[in-house]
Amino acid sequence: MTPNEQYSGGLPPLVPSAPAIDPWNWPPDSGWSPQRNLIGYHVKATDGNVGKIDMATHAQDASYLVVDARRWIFGSTLVVPAGLVSVIDHSEQNVYLICTKELVKSAPPLKPVDGKFTNRPDRDKLARYYRAALSR
């Protein structure tokens, strides 16, 4: 099954030279630090604003952002794997992603279990989605 068959609606356009990602770990040169609180930072895709960070985790192989995207997608909270972050600008409180808004919007949903997004099958599906889309 191709990524386009697996995720209805096809895959949106993205940055042509996007690097391979490790979805659930912060990129080493992103500017992430466990001492910095990212709550309230703006999340920006390559083509515009996604929303504001409600939660950021820093667990090995399980790091992600929970983004309030209600202004963009009515009633939506999105989970963005930390590996999609290209750089964090602490002075402007912006987190920049390596993909488009449409790629984030079209991602398979990740449902919380006990308030955390740790459901392994859903996380694996989300990781496959981003790896397939970003490796094109």
Language-model-detected regions and their locations in the chain:
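Peripheral interaction segments used for macromolecular assembly
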Residues: 1-136
